[in-house]
A protein has these predicted regions:
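Short beta-strand segments at enzyme active-site cores
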Residues: 33, 60-61, 94-100, 132-137, ...
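Active-site groove signature of glycoside hydrolases
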Residues: 88-109, 134-144
C-alpha cells in the first residue's frame, strides 16, 4: 500500500510545492491536492516536473461540483468537473472523491433520486478521463441528526447505492474514522473486494464512546483507539495495494509547524503499519 497525505491536519502550509517537499522528505508516496490549480500555477510541464522531482504521485482530487443542492448549481458545475478531470489526468491521477453526509434537509427519497442521477453523470464524465469516483460514507452520530432527515451513513448502504448508480468506475472512499464510528469490524472489511475501494483515509479517534466522537475532532494515526493495525491488515489481506492517505480534521488549527506535524504523521504511519505486519 502507498502512504499518502492530504493537507488536513498539517498546519499552515504556504503552497503546494512546500506540501510536496514535506511529503517527500518524510518518505510518503503520494499527496492529494487540486490538480487544476497546480497546473494553473506551474503549467502542465512544471506540475509534472514537481511530482517527478519529489518522487510523488497524485493520489486523488476532490469532486469539484455541488451535487447536493439545486439542479442549476449542479449543471453550472459540470464544466469545472470536466476541467478538473482533464487536469488530474494530465498529472496521472485516476481518483476523484466526495463525501456523503448522513442526513439532509431535503426529502430523502427525492434527494436520493436526484443524487443518484447526478453522481452517475459525474462518474460518466470522470470515466471519459479514466478516473474513478469514490463515495465516502460518514459515520459520526452527531451528523446523523444535524439536518432534518436521515440519509446514508453505513458502508453497506453506500455499496448498495453504488450498485444503483450503476457505473463501473464508482466505489468507496473508505475512511478509518467512519469505519470506527459505524462500529464496523475487520470481518466487515474482509468481505470487500479490492475493486470496490477507490481510496482510503487514515486517522485516529479519541478514547470516547463511539456515539460521542465528533467528525472534526480527529487525531493522528496511532494516537487513539481505532484498530488501525487491524484495518490495514484487512485491506492487505483482501489485496488492496493503493493509496492510504492521512486526513486529520480538527476543531482548531494545529499550533505545531508543518514540519513537526508531517514528522508526527510519519511516526504514526510507521507505528500502525509495523503493527499490521506491513
Amino acid at each position: 500500500m502507498l502512504k499518502g497525505l492530504t493537507r488536513a491536519g498539517l498546519g499552515a502550509i504556504e503552497n503546494d510545492e512546500q506540501f510536496l517537499k514535506l511529503a517527500s522528505d518524510a518518505g510518503f508516496d503520494s499527496v492529494d491536492l487540486n490538480a487544476k490549480a497546480l497546473i494553473e500555477q506551474y503549467g502542465q510541464e512544471g506540475a509534472i516536473e514537481l511530482f517527478q522531482r519529489y518522487n510523488l504521485q497524485l493520489g486523488s482530487i476532490d469532486l469539484p461540483i455541488e451535487w447536493r443542492a439545486d439542479e442549476e448549481a449542479f449543471l453550472a458545475g459540470l464544466p469545472a468537473l470536466t476541467e478538473a478531470a482533464a487536469a488530474a489526468r494530465k498529472l496521472g491521477c485516476t481518483r476523484c472523491c466526495t463525501y456523503v453526509l448522513p442526513s439532509t434537509d431535503q426529502m430523502p427519497a427525492h434527494f436520493m433520486a436526484l443524487a443518484t442521477r447526478r453522481l452517475r453523470i459525474c462518474a460518466q464524465v470522470l470515466g471519459a478521463y479514466r478516473i474513478r469516483l469514490g463515495l465516502e460514507f460518514v459515520g459520526p452520530h452527531h451528523l446523523r441528526t444535524a439536518w432534518k432527515h436521515p440519509f446514508i451513513w453505513t458502508m453497506q448502504d453506500t455499496l448498495d447505492w453504488i450498485d444503483a448508480i450503476g457505473e463501473p468506475n464508482v466505489g468507496l472512499l473508505l475512511d478509518a474514522y467512519h469505519w470506527h464510528t459505524n462500529s464496523l469490524t475487520v470481518t466487515d472489511l474482509e468481505r470487500l473486494q479490492p475493486h470496490q475501494i477507490v481510496h482510503v483515509h487514515l486517522n485516529d479517534a479519541k478514547d470516547l464512546p463511539v456515539d460521542q466522537i465528533l467528525d472534526n475532532d480527529r487525531i493522528y494515526p496511532g494516537e487513539g483507539i481505532i484498530d488501525l493495525p487491524g484495518f490495514l491488515h484487512a485491506l492487505n489481506k483482501i489485496g488492496y495495494t493503493d493509496f492510504v492517505t492521512q486526513e486529520i480534521l480538527t476543531p482548531s488549527a494545529p499550533t505545531e509547524s508543518p514540519e513537526e506535524l508531517v514528522q508526527r504523521s510519519k511516526k504514526g504511519y510507521a507505528q500502525v503499519f509495523s503493527a499490521a505486519g506491513l
